[in-house]
Amino acid sequence: MGSKYPRSLRCCLPLWAFGLQVTFILLFYFLIGQDPIQADHKFMAIYQVIQDLTLVAALGFGFLSSSFRRHGWSSVAFSFFMLALGVQGTILLDYFLNWVLDWNMIKNPFSPFLSIQRATISTLPLLISAGAVLGKVNLVQLAVMVLVEAMTFGAIRVADKKVFRIEDHIIMMYGHVFGAYFGLTVAWWLSKSLPRRRHENAQTEKVQMTTSSSLFAMLGTLFLWIFWPSINSALLEGTKKKNAVFNTYYALAVSTVTATSMSALSHPKGKINMVHIHNAVLAGGVAVGAPSCLISSPWIAMVLGLTAGLISIWGAKCPQVCLSDLLLNPSGIHYTFGLPGLLGALTYYCLHIIAESRPSNLWIVTQTITDVGALSFAMAMGMVTGLLTGCLLSVKVWRAPHAVKYFDDQAFWEFPHLAVEF
């Protein structure tokens, strides 16, 4: 019987990807000039942060999504492709945002080097959302998704800066929530057009983990765990940066212990589930992201890490409650990034009120309402644009894979040792 996989991407993929890359080169030629940074010490400090962020994006998220037994190559390579494409597009977008937010480009010149730092951290929501659709889409669809999501997140940044007056650090922390619900909405729409039983049967065998694939996913978790303090502190300075690093380590440590112990407790025979370790150990770092610079005592960060770990394990064990079963999301981004991100935002609001509250101080009330509005706006934009992106990716021109070819590397990669090609 012939393969049910759609026609070859030989024409569609090179034309789209190469044309997009040439367009980026031309835009860089006309818009991006020499970097104004002169001090070597400042250059090296920023470069170290960029290195950490790149390790998180390329190795951490790449290997984290490689746990599926027949989709390891595509998960790692496609995530890397999204990172490379997303950074270029976000740098160009950052140039236009810099012009929109600050028209005086002579007094405050655009710094491509600083933009690389912002662009790398801005691609993290893209990689988070990719966890919900990897294995169900091809590389052309991912490229389209990168462009739409990058522009949407750029619009959110403009709105948060100009309308809500939110700090860059908080905007980027909201990006975890935005990326999670954007990806979940896209995945929901893509699965909506398929019969439920057929979709589940197509995924049952291929989403299972093997020892080697699970080990690579654990390697990605370790990279994320080690360098997550760099994410939470990348856009902070001075004492706030130091507090963010310390508190992130505390929260990560506690969520790791919580995830391990609760995973054993939730199993009838006291065995640990590796999926819980992949995801729940990171929940503390995600939850502490927004309030990390406001936390003055380690115990607060540790309690937050404990709560985030419990929520993540609860989400993994009760998928119907956390919508994971409805959305058919085997990567678990909802209870790894979505719910812990919301917990972190709630904690940030509470700590902000406690730190700034004074008798008859209406400013803190107004600011809190504004912060809640900014988060709600990010979530709403994520779900609305995710729905539109799902509709766009469903168009047949992208030659999407059939459900029977979900989570299958053979649809995209050359395997010389196999006699039958797809």
Curated annotation (Swiss-Prot):
Q: Which residues cross the membrane?
A: 13-33, 43-63, 76-96, 113-135, 137-159, 170-190, 215-235, 244-266, 272-292, 294-314, 335-355, 372-392
Q: Which InterPro entries match?
A: Ammonium/urea_transptr, NH4_transpt_AmtB-like_dom, RhesusRHD
> What is the recorded post-translational modification?
Palmitoylated.
Question: Record's Gene3D superfamilies?
Answer: Ammonium transporter AmtB like domains (1.10.3430.10)
Its annotated compartments are: Cell membrane
Which GO terms are recorded in the biological process aspect for this UniProt protein? ammonium homeostasis; ammonium transmembrane transport; erythrocyte development; multicellular organismal-level iron ion homeostasis
Q: Which GO terms describe its cellular component?
A: membrane; plasma membrane
Lipid bilayer topology: Multi-pass membrane protein
Question: Transmembrane helix: is it a keyword of this entry?
Answer: yes
- Superkingdom of the source species: Eukaryota
Q: What is stated as this protein's family in its record?
A: Belongs to the ammonium transporter (TC 2.A.49) family. Rh subfamily.
Q: Which PANTHER family match?
A: AMMONIUM TRANSPORTER, BLOOD GROUP RH(CE) POLYPEPTIDE-RELATED
General function of this protein? May be part of an oligomeric complex which is likely to have a transport or channel function in the erythrocyte membrane.
Name-wise, this protein is: Blood group Rh(D) polypeptide
Organism, by scientific name, is Rattus norvegicus (Rat)
Could you tell me the gene encoding this protein? Rhd
